[in-house]
Amino acid sequence: MAKRFLLLLPLLSTILLLSVSVTESEAYSTTKPCQGYKPDKFTHLHFYFHDVISGDKPTAVKVAEARRTNSSNVNFGVIMIADDPLTEGPDPSSKEVGRAQGMYALTAMKNISFTMVFNLAFTAGEFNGSTVAMYGRNEIFSKVREMPIIGGTGAFRFARGYAQAKTYKVVGLDAVVEYNVFIWH
């Protein structure tokens, strides 16, 4: 058995080396530039984002914090995971159009600023089943904040654009935020 293996070892080594060299030499040939692609649609979305931290059924929960967080006046180091409803109107009972699923972290040491990583997953209407990926800085005490749209799925493939967030209402730690999202796709 060992002799057979020793006889096959050079053959297996050769096959492995050839497969590695073929893989490396073809790495760029599998990716072709997208020639002449131009986004053909522009979409403006308007909805309200409900971030609920308090109560029996929170939609955002703290999953981590740094040891120094309690000594920070801006909660630096806190990480939250969220599955927040997106609705047509500012009232939490208005029609739900999707969910903001992702996380945000308090990443500034001198002010309250989040780094937001969210998929806006649409569950109703024309864009049901589609998502938009949003990633960026959200300095929550600024009147209007802008975050980039970096991709999407379904109707929003190849999406790019930006989202503008404006705080509508804050009660304790819970917030309702108005969003205007401008997407080329």
From Swiss-Prot:
It comes from the Eukaryota. Residues 1-27 form the signal peptide. Glycans are attached at residues 70, 111, 128. Keywords: Apoplast, Glycoprotein, Secreted, Signal. It is found in: Secreted, Extracellular space, Apoplast. One of its GO terms (biological process) is phenylpropanoid biosynthetic process. One of its GO terms (cellular component) is apoplast. Coiled coil: none annotated. InterPro entries: Allene_oxi_cyc_Dirigent (IPR044859), Dirigent (IPR004265). Belongs to the plant dirigent protein family. Homodimer. Dirigent proteins impart stereoselectivity on the phenoxy radical-coupling reaction, yielding optically active lignans from two molecules of coniferyl alcohol in the biosynthesis of lignans, flavonolignans, and alkaloids and thus plays a central role in plant secondary metabolism. This is Dirigent protein 2. The lineage of its organism: Eukaryota, Viridiplantae, Streptophyta, Embryophyta, Tracheophyta.
